[in-house]
Amino acid sequence: MKTSLSTYQEAADFLAGLIPDMPQTAIILGSGLGALADRLTDATAIPYAAIPHFSRSTATGHKGNLLFGHLGSQSVMAMQGRFHYYEGYSMEQVTFPIRVMALLGVRRLLVSNAAGGINNTFHVGDLMIIRDHINMMPNPLIGPNDERFGPRFPDMTRAYDRDLIRAAEEIALEQGITLRKGVYVGLTGPSYETPAEYAAYGRLGGDAIGMSTVPEVIVARHAGLRVFGMSVITNEGYHFADDFVNDADEVVRAANRTTDVMTRLFTALIERTE
């Protein structure tokens, strides 16, 4: 059964009653990147458990709070943890917050994630601007379409906003930040990819691979939000050593090491595009 508009509206009304001045920019903080939320000033934290119809985040490094505050001089909403298909949630549950954001007037969505490096020029700790994606998950728009959110067949030619990408590249140049740019492959997980899968998705055009982001981006674009995405490369999947083992805690540690740089970049990007 599809979630009704009134269900999304109930969550939106609850949040609007707590936060009178709603931001137009939202950030989704992925694995290990929730620490960026610690940089918010004048922050109000609302646990997901308190928000009507929100799910609970169970993934490593995801604290499960919706934050409202300021990053630099601009007001933002930040999801300190997201929902994943591999947690057993439906695609509607995974993307529920995005439609609530749209009802609250959010116009820009910045998404981040931890990802494995497919491209053999990428290294652990690199930041990759997502210029496009390859979706290997069920599409979250399958089922009856509610035209009040968006069209039946939304265009995905420019899923990631070119002006936001250009602005991020300019900021990185000004601040001496090295950025990569590439295609993110979204898989369901929860098992990490085999070496053969890394090689196969590389041949398809993928540069980095992970278990999130794509469903939220599809629903955000369906609702007309501008999207910017960034991946933190947390392993180098193109040359696994014989004794290499993917480890969720190490993914979080690798992502955490980029928090300072990502915070500077996201702060400047939000201020430049307001």
Language model features: what each stretch is:
Residues 149-160, 186, 198, 254-267:
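Polyanion-binding loop/helix "lid" in catalytic or ligand-binding cores
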Residues 102-105, 202, 221:
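Non-catalytic positions within long, well-ordered alpha-helices that form the structural scaffold/packing
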Residues 1-156:
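Metabolite-binding pocket within alpha/beta catalytic cores that recognizes anionic/polar moieties
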Residues 211-249:
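Zn-dependent metallopeptidase/amidohydrolase metal-coordination segment
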Residues 238-274:
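His/Asp/Glu-rich mid-to-C-terminal helical/loop segments that flank catalytic regions of hydrolases
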Residues 107-108, 207, 226:
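Short acidic/polar active-site loop segments enriched in Thr and Asp
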Residues 165, 171-207, 266, 273:
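Active-site/ligand-binding-proximal alpha/beta "capping" segment
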